[in-house]
A protein has these predicted regions:
Chain A
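Hydrophobic/aromatic ligand-binding patch that stacks against planar heteroaromatic rings
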Residues: 114-118
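Short glycine-rich anion-binding loops that position phosphate/pyrophosphate groups of nucleotides
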Residues: 12, 40, 72, 97-100, ...
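Short, glycine-/small-residue-rich phosphate/pyrophosphate-handling segment
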Residues: 126-153
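C-terminal accessory domains and tails appended to enzymatic cores
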Residues: 158, 162-164, 168-257
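Short beta-strand segments
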Residues: 9, 35-37, 94-97, 128-129, ...
Length: 257, 257
């Protein structure tokens, strides 16, 4: 039996530690190709590059096919599928992000967006993130990844939801298990530092931290805090069915000019 | 009674025709402030600027308070709320985008993302887009905007869904009405043009067009094609409830290391 093709990407750049570990584990299950940004692209969300040329470089590496893209994580998936791969990959893996992607800040995440782009073209996908610590410690992360990637290669793995996987930093010592969770409402609480440049122009630096407002153990961020690996199934069909049902019959929408 | 504060933004830049018309109509209902990108930021999605300083300029204009931000549409909303406004606006309006934001390509849209950022902080929001034509013709668009903005200032207007409003280019002659719609599955069908620079480095330009695969009149893109203004209520709570219900009891998630 031929080995499945697995596309590996991220938003921290092709040379990050996280993508190296993800690719090492994925290589146990299939033929991998890395197509990832040339540098840190955190916060790029589902952005695409429309008005600039997108540079592509093949990285010199004897053991692994790696392409570096001067663009966003979503650009990487699109260019891989449209121009680099001979066949459709069986699975697209994104990460391992250096830092959590939980709560509302998921919307800003390039790691998750590479995965949502994948399911939009019908390819199953997982986004992996490891909780930040002073020195990112990836000990034991491979054990979690092995279990999840093996499962994702099963025929019944969904291609219409993204598995958003977040791993607590305690994984280097122990974890309490894996939890299927909901996206929480916790948000990134920004502080904008206002400064002046030498020519007296105003500019800002953004800073801040996740504001924890959740308590239920089935919420992504709370599961992590309690030492669980969190898996949130995300759908990108955005229509609010509830709003449609409650408002469909309102006269307002029958307006004729 | 004091007039409500309305924040106006977009992704085409503060000097675009679309935002001027949107702001003109909004001014009939409240005190407006424009905080918008300094240039075209289409395709920036929900991106935020994490690793660069974000420049801010007050634009010299006697009749209207305008700030220009060297950042994404979401940066504009965040900086306005965090640093520029004395009080929370009653409503945040985004657009009018020069071109539709329908189907799956909503995910790439800076116009829609400024609106989704707004509901994440609990402020009602509408994203407006006008179908592209060779010369963007905004005739009669103000009539539609007036009706929708007036409605959005009602106390019962939702602050947990975005109204994604798309207006057909036929509005300059006639429209057939307003339809409450669903987000379609039509996607942007990209073509990547591969080129070489003078130093033999590979780069790509992206090009393409919306691929229409929908037929039901209650789908955003089909409503537009049939001469209706399309209003899709969008929610950004991404958890797939369906997946949770179907998989919650699976042993897989009880894994103990």
């Amino acid at each position: 039996m031929s080995r499945p093709l697995i596309l590996v990407t991220n938003d921290d750049g092709y040379s990050s530690k996280g993508i190296e570990i993800l690719n090492n584990v994925a290589s146990n299950f299939g033929d991998t190709i890395i197509v990832a940004p040339n540098s840190e692209k955190s916060g790029k969300a589902h952005g695409i590059t429309l008005y600039d040329p997108i540079g592509l470089k093949k990285i010199d590496n004897q053991n692994q096919l790696i392409y570096s893209v001067d663009g966003t994580p979503v650009d990487c998936v699109k260019i891989a599928i449209n121009s680099l791969l001979d066949k459709k990959p069986k699975l697209i893996l994104s990460g391992i992000n250096h830092g959590l992607n939980v709560g509302r800040s998921i919307l800003y995440s390039g790691t998750v967006s590479a995965a949502s782009e994948s399911i939009m073209i019908g390819i199953p996908s997982i986004a992996f993130s490891l909780q930040k610590s002073e020195e990112m410690d990836f000990t034991n992360v491979d054990i979690i990844l092995e279990k999840l990637i093996k499962n994702a290669l099963d025929e019944d793995f969904p291609n219409d939801v993204v598995w958003n996987v977040n791993i607590p930093k305690t994984v280097n010592e122990k974890i309490n298990g894996i939890k299927l969770t909901k996206q929480g409402k916790s948000n990134f609480n920004e502080i904008y530092h206002k400064r002046k440049d030498p020519r007296n122009n105003t500019y800002f630096w953004v800073d801040g931290a996740i504001e924890s407002i959740e308590e239920d153990l089935d919420v992504d961020e709370v599961a992590i805090r309690n030492g669980y690996v969190s898996i949130t199934p995300l759908s990108f069909e955005l229509t609010s069915q509830k709003y449609l049902e409650n408002n469909q019959s309102k006269g307002f929408f029958d307006f004729e000019k």
